[in-house]
């Protein structure tokens, strides 16, 4: 189960506008960006959360519709706010690992040991 699909399913199922309002597109994996956009547009237009049935009628793009059907099939028992926290943690960890990877790729080969340690301390702080 993907955390993003579980979050979207729960937010739509329980109509949790509060959790959705603090969910950012960049927290989601790229394959969910189009579905996020459709939900966000519906919220801005109608000032309420769409149902899954509403989205089935609104979505014209077949890839986005397929993603919605996949989300609908997910079995979820967790609360939306908890799923959002998990998604934020996953996003943050990925950003940290990407930063460390960039640091290693760009600097380790060109620095001595002390400079590398100093740069790692700067990243941590």
Residue ranges and their predicted role:
Residues 1-90:
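Noncatalytic partner-interaction/assembly domains of nucleic-acid and motor enzyme complexes
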Residues 73-125:
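Interdomain "pre-motor" coupling segment immediately N-terminal to P-loop NTPase/helicase cores
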């Amino acid at each position: 189960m993907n955390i993003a699909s579980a979050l979207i399913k729960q937010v739509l199922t329980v109509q949790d506008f509060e959790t959705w309002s603090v969910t950012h597109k960049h927290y989601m994996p790229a394959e969910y960006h189009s579905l996020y956009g459709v939900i966000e547009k519906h919220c801005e237009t109608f000032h309420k959360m769409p149902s899954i049935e509403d989205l089935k009628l609104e979505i014209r793009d077949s890839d986005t519709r397929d993603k919605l059907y996949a989300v609908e099939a997910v079995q979820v028992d967790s609360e939306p706010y908890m799923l959002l926290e998990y998604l934020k943690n996953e996003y943050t960890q990925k950003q940290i690992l990407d930063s460390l990877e960039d640091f290693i790729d760009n600097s380790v080969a060109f620095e001595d040991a002390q400079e590398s340690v100093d740069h790692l301390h700067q990243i941590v702080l």
